Amino acid sequence: MRIVVTGGCGFIGSSFVNLINKVPNTEIVVIDKLTYASNPFLIPKDIPLIKKDICDITLDDIGYADYIVNFAAESHVDKSIHNGLPFVKSNVEGTFNMIEIAKQIPNLKKFVQISTDEVYGDMESRRIGEADEHTSLEPSSYYSATKAAADHLVTAAGRTYGLPYLITRTCNNY
Protein backbone atom coordinates (compact mmCIF):
# COMPACT_ATOMS: atom_id res chain seq x y z
CA MET A 1 0.00 0.00 0.00
CA ARG A 2 1.47 3.34 -1.09
CA ILE A 3 0.17 6.40 0.72
CA VAL A 4 0.91 10.05 0.01
CA VAL A 5 0.21 12.28 3.01
CA THR A 6 0.09 16.01 2.37
CA GLY A 7 0.60 18.19 5.42
CA GLY A 8 2.23 15.21 7.10
CA CYS A 9 4.52 17.34 9.26
CA GLY A 10 1.62 19.14 10.94
CA PHE A 11 0.23 18.16 14.33
CA ILE A 12 -2.57 15.89 13.14
CA GLY A 13 -0.90 14.81 9.90
CA SER A 14 2.23 13.64 11.70
CA SER A 15 0.13 11.67 14.19
CA PHE A 16 -1.54 9.92 11.25
CA VAL A 17 1.84 9.23 9.62
CA ASN A 18 3.20 7.71 12.83
CA LEU A 19 0.11 5.53 13.22
CA ILE A 20 -0.08 4.31 9.62
CA ASN A 21 3.68 3.67 9.64
CA LYS A 22 2.97 0.71 11.95
CA VAL A 23 0.92 -1.05 9.24
CA PRO A 24 3.00 -3.75 7.52
CA ASN A 25 3.79 -3.37 3.82
CA THR A 26 2.96 0.33 3.80
CA GLU A 27 5.05 2.88 1.94
CA ILE A 28 4.49 6.48 3.01
CA VAL A 29 5.66 9.68 1.36
CA VAL A 30 5.02 12.96 3.15
CA ILE A 31 4.58 16.21 1.26
CA ASP A 32 4.73 19.36 3.35
CA LYS A 33 5.40 23.03 2.65
CA LEU A 34 7.04 23.26 6.10
CA THR A 35 5.31 26.43 7.30
CA TYR A 36 5.00 27.75 10.85
CA ALA A 37 2.62 24.88 11.66
CA SER A 38 4.97 22.10 10.53
CA ASN A 39 7.68 20.16 12.28
CA PRO A 40 9.61 17.60 10.21
CA PHE A 41 11.02 16.06 13.40
CA LEU A 42 7.56 14.68 14.20
CA ILE A 43 7.81 12.01 11.49
CA PRO A 44 10.25 9.08 11.36
CA LYS A 45 13.51 9.84 9.55
CA ASP A 46 13.10 6.90 7.19
CA ILE A 47 9.89 8.30 5.67
CA PRO A 48 10.59 10.34 2.53
CA LEU A 49 9.69 14.02 2.85
CA ILE A 50 9.08 16.23 -0.17
CA LYS A 51 9.21 19.91 0.76
CA LYS A 52 6.66 21.36 -1.62
CA ASP A 53 3.49 23.43 -1.73
CA ILE A 54 0.50 21.31 -2.80
CA CYS A 55 -0.22 23.91 -5.48
CA ASP A 56 3.05 22.80 -7.11
CA ILE A 57 2.68 19.01 -6.85
CA THR A 58 2.79 17.13 -10.15
CA LEU A 59 1.84 13.67 -11.34
CA ASP A 60 5.56 12.81 -11.30
CA ASP A 61 5.56 13.48 -7.54
CA ILE A 62 2.62 11.23 -6.60
CA GLY A 63 1.51 9.21 -9.63
CA TYR A 64 2.30 5.92 -7.87
CA ALA A 65 -0.10 6.49 -4.94
CA ASP A 66 -2.78 4.02 -3.90
CA TYR A 67 -4.13 6.55 -1.40
CA ILE A 68 -3.81 10.31 -1.06
CA VAL A 69 -4.59 11.75 2.36
CA ASN A 70 -4.85 15.52 2.15
CA PHE A 71 -4.12 17.14 5.51
CA ALA A 72 -2.38 20.13 3.90
CA ALA A 73 -4.15 23.38 4.74
CA GLU A 74 -3.85 26.81 6.16
CA SER A 75 -5.80 26.26 9.35
CA HIS A 76 -5.51 29.21 11.73
CA VAL A 77 -9.00 30.77 11.91
CA ASP A 78 -7.81 34.12 13.32
CA LYS A 79 -5.16 34.47 10.61
CA SER A 80 -7.82 33.87 7.97
CA ILE A 81 -9.84 36.80 9.28
CA HIS A 82 -6.94 39.19 8.71
CA ASN A 83 -5.66 37.73 5.43
CA GLY A 84 -7.75 35.18 3.57
CA LEU A 85 -5.66 34.86 0.41
CA PRO A 86 -3.21 32.22 1.74
CA PHE A 87 -6.25 30.14 2.74
CA VAL A 88 -7.74 30.37 -0.75
CA LYS A 89 -4.41 29.40 -2.31
CA SER A 90 -3.72 26.40 -0.06
CA ASN A 91 -7.16 25.13 0.81
CA VAL A 92 -8.93 25.73 -2.52
CA GLU A 93 -6.28 25.95 -5.24
CA GLY A 94 -4.04 23.38 -3.56
CA THR A 95 -6.86 20.89 -3.11
CA PHE A 96 -7.98 21.47 -6.71
CA ASN A 97 -4.45 20.72 -7.91
CA MET A 98 -4.35 17.51 -5.86
CA ILE A 99 -7.73 16.45 -7.29
CA GLU A 100 -6.60 17.10 -10.86
CA ILE A 101 -3.56 14.90 -10.29
CA ALA A 102 -5.56 12.22 -8.47
CA LYS A 103 -7.90 11.95 -11.46
CA GLN A 104 -4.89 10.88 -13.56
CA ILE A 105 -3.77 8.07 -11.23
CA PRO A 106 -5.26 4.90 -12.74
CA ASN A 107 -5.15 2.69 -9.64
CA LEU A 108 -5.97 5.27 -6.98
CA LYS A 109 -8.11 3.60 -4.35
CA LYS A 110 -9.13 6.69 -2.36
CA PHE A 111 -8.62 10.43 -2.07
CA VAL A 112 -9.13 11.28 1.60
CA GLN A 113 -9.93 14.94 2.26
CA ILE A 114 -9.30 16.02 5.84
CA SER A 115 -11.74 18.81 6.56
CA THR A 116 -13.12 20.46 9.67
CA ASP A 117 -16.35 20.77 11.63
CA GLU A 118 -15.92 24.54 11.20
CA VAL A 119 -17.67 24.17 7.82
CA TYR A 120 -20.96 23.75 9.72
CA GLY A 121 -20.69 27.15 11.38
CA ASP A 122 -21.77 27.85 14.93
CA MET A 123 -23.61 24.73 16.02
CA GLU A 124 -24.97 26.37 19.19
CA SER A 125 -26.65 29.24 17.39
CA ARG A 126 -28.01 26.78 14.83
CA ARG A 127 -29.35 24.65 17.70
CA ILE A 128 -27.84 21.54 16.20
CA GLY A 129 -26.36 19.05 18.62
CA GLU A 130 -24.71 16.84 16.03
CA ALA A 131 -23.80 17.12 12.38
CA ASP A 132 -23.77 14.43 9.73
CA GLU A 133 -23.21 14.32 5.98
CA HIS A 134 -26.64 15.87 5.40
CA THR A 135 -26.10 18.92 7.63
CA SER A 136 -25.89 22.12 5.60
CA LEU A 137 -22.59 23.97 5.47
CA GLU A 138 -22.60 27.49 6.94
CA PRO A 139 -18.95 28.57 7.23
CA SER A 140 -18.25 31.74 9.20
CA SER A 141 -14.59 32.53 8.42
CA TYR A 142 -12.35 32.44 5.39
CA TYR A 143 -10.77 29.32 6.88
CA SER A 144 -14.05 27.43 7.11
CA ALA A 145 -15.28 28.81 3.77
CA THR A 146 -12.16 27.60 1.98
CA LYS A 147 -12.39 24.18 3.62
CA ALA A 148 -16.06 23.95 2.58
CA ALA A 149 -15.06 24.92 -0.97
CA ALA A 150 -12.40 22.20 -0.97
CA ASP A 151 -14.97 19.66 0.24
CA HIS A 152 -17.31 20.67 -2.58
CA LEU A 153 -14.50 20.30 -5.13
CA VAL A 154 -13.72 16.79 -3.87
CA THR A 155 -17.40 15.83 -3.95
CA ALA A 156 -17.80 17.26 -7.46
CA ALA A 157 -14.77 15.29 -8.68
CA GLY A 158 -16.30 12.15 -7.21
CA ARG A 159 -19.64 12.71 -8.87
CA THR A 160 -18.35 14.01 -12.21
CA TYR A 161 -15.19 11.98 -12.76
CA GLY A 162 -15.67 8.99 -10.49
CA LEU A 163 -12.83 9.98 -8.15
CA PRO A 164 -13.01 7.59 -5.19
CA TYR A 165 -13.11 9.83 -2.13
CA LEU A 166 -13.84 10.19 1.54
CA ILE A 167 -14.22 13.46 3.45
CA THR A 168 -13.71 13.62 7.20
CA ARG A 169 -14.73 16.67 9.22
CA THR A 170 -12.87 16.50 12.48
CA CYS A 171 -13.49 18.75 15.46
CA ASN A 172 -10.95 20.79 17.40
CA ASN A 173 -8.43 18.52 19.05
CA TYR A 174 -7.04 20.73 21.81
Model-derived segments and spans:
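N-terminal Rossmann-like NAD(P)+-binding domain of SDR-like oxidoreductases, especially those catalyzing
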Residues: 1-173
